[in-house]
UniProtKB/Swiss-Prot annotation:
Subcellular location field: Cytoplasm
Stated family: Belongs to the SecB family.
GO cellular component, one term: cytoplasm
Gene assigned in the entry: secB
Full protein name: Protein-export protein SecB
Top-rank taxon, per record: Bacteria
Species: Haemophilus ducreyi (strain 35000HP / ATCC 700724)
Gene Ontology biological process: protein folding; protein tetramerization; protein transport
InterPro entries: SecB, SecB-like_sf
């Protein structure tokens, strides 16, 4: 066996195998409001899109987690400021995750599970907007890995700032 193959085999052995299984994917909550229909259709369509995304995790049992993806999309018209529509979706899933702990488990729950749920939520939002007879809304993909890294960096920064603000003990 060559040295490269031995190194690759050693690295593969060191990596902990893990299991991620989708148990169920479902809509936990959905709301679509178009408060200014039908008068909004008589205005020039220059939309301003608002997009908010968040995740929530609930541990249901050992190795069993519910992940909820919260997405709020709102559109107002640029000229009048009138709200065209507000769409709120909570797309959820139950996942079995084995073989991960600590930061690796947190990464899976904050990145891999939402990546599974997002296409379902995106399709639901597009369908609701279409049923409201608005122009098609195609939401861009989301890089949940990058969002997780940003979250970790913010946590580190907040911890460092909190440490700086803590007064030093008085010496006698």
């Amino acid at each position: 066996m060559s040295e490269e193959n031995q190194v690759a085999a050693t690295e593969a052995e060191e990596q902990t195998p893990f299991e991620l299984q989708i148990q169920r994917i479902y809509i936990k909550d959905v709301s679509f409001e178009a408060p200014n229909l039908p008068t909004i259709f008589h205005q020039e369509w220059k939309p301003q899109l608002g997009f908010e995304l968040d995740t929530e995790t609930v541990k249901l049992a050992d190795d069993l987690y519910e992940v909820i993806l919260h997405i709020n999309v709102s559109t107002t018209l640029e000229d009048s400021g009138d709200t065209a529509f507000i769409c709120e979706v909570k797309q959820a899933g139950v996942f079995t995750i084995k073989g991960l702990e600590g930061i690796q488990l947190a990464h899976c729950l904050a990145s891999q599970c939402p990546s599974v749920l997002y296409p379902y939520a995106r399709e639901l939002i597009a369908s609701l907007v279409n049923r409201g007879t608005f122009p098609a809304l195609n939401l861009s993909p989301v890089n949940f890995d990058a969002l997780f890294v940003d979250y970790l960096q913010r946590q580190e920064q907040e911890a460092a700032e909190a440490e700086e603000e803590t007064p030093a003990p008085a010496s006698n």
